[in-house]
Regions:
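Ligand-binding loop in jelly-roll beta-barrel domains
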Residues: 33, 70, 90-116
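Short, conserved beta-strand element in jelly-roll/cupin
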Residues: 39-45, 54-73, 109-110
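Short acidic (Asp/Glu) patches
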Residues: 23-24, 47, 89-92
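A short, N-terminal "cap"/entry segment at the start of jelly-roll beta-barrel domains
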Residues: 1-37, 129-166
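Hydrophobic small-molecule pocket/channel-lining residues, especially in calycin-type beta-barrels
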Residues: 2, 48, 56, 69, ...
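Short acidic-glycine-tyrosine-enriched beta hairpin
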Residues: 75-93
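A hydrophobic, small-residue-rich beta->alpha segment in the mid-to-C-terminal subdomain
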Residues: 105, 116-133
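Short histidine-centered beta-strand/loop micro-motifs
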Residues: 28-31, 51-56, 97-99
């Protein structure tokens, strides 16, 4: 099937909407394939963790571009380096951490693709003048709107499993 003339068929390495605080770039959005999936490119510096959470509406997978990340998925620890795919099915809690010494970059796929606006809204929360309690409440409310459940109770376990001192 030929590409439609009004559809973009090449997205360059420096293209996409970049969210600087999250170091996330929207690459493939819902408008490209009617919401079937989205892809974002994400950077994660050494020592940074994305806390345990569960997606109730979409499956996710990550393709590692650079560096290494440690994933904690449903109680299992997996180390992924460049070239690896990591599958995170909906309904299974997961966290990830850069336990290495160099920045990591990865592509994150969301299937279906209605999740992309979450990142835009989360960026606004992070850059706001809210105190930590207000920010946490806003993150929980945002998660409820997008089907994300944050597991604050699993953070100590994740930190211990990752071997980091947060």
């Amino acid at each position: 099937m030929a590409a439609k003339e009004n559809k973009k068929i090449l997205i360059g390495p420096d293209e996409g909407t970049h969210l600087p605080i999250l170091d996330l770039t929207h690459k493939v959005t819902t408008e490209h394939f009617g919401g079937a999936f989205t892809i974002v490119e994400v950077g994660l510096p050494p020592g940074e963790m994305i806390p345990p959470h569960t997606h109730t509406r979409e499956d996710e997978c990550n393709f590692m571009l650079e560096g290494e990340l440690t994933f904690y998925i449903g109680g299992e620890i997996v180390l992924a380096s460049a070239g690896a795919f990591v599958l995170k099915p909906r309904g299974v809690y997961h966290a990830l951490c850069n336990t290495g010494t160099v920045p990591a970059r990865f592509l994150e796929f969301h299937i279906p693709g209605e999740f992309e606006n979450y990142y835009d809204e989360y960026e606004q929360i992070v850059e706001s003048a809210m105190d930590e309690d207000e920010r946490l409440k806003a993150r929980v409310e945002l998660g409820e709107r997008y089907g994300v459940i944050w597991h604050e109770d699993l953070i100590p376990e994740a930190i211990a499993r990752f071997g980091i001192g947060h």
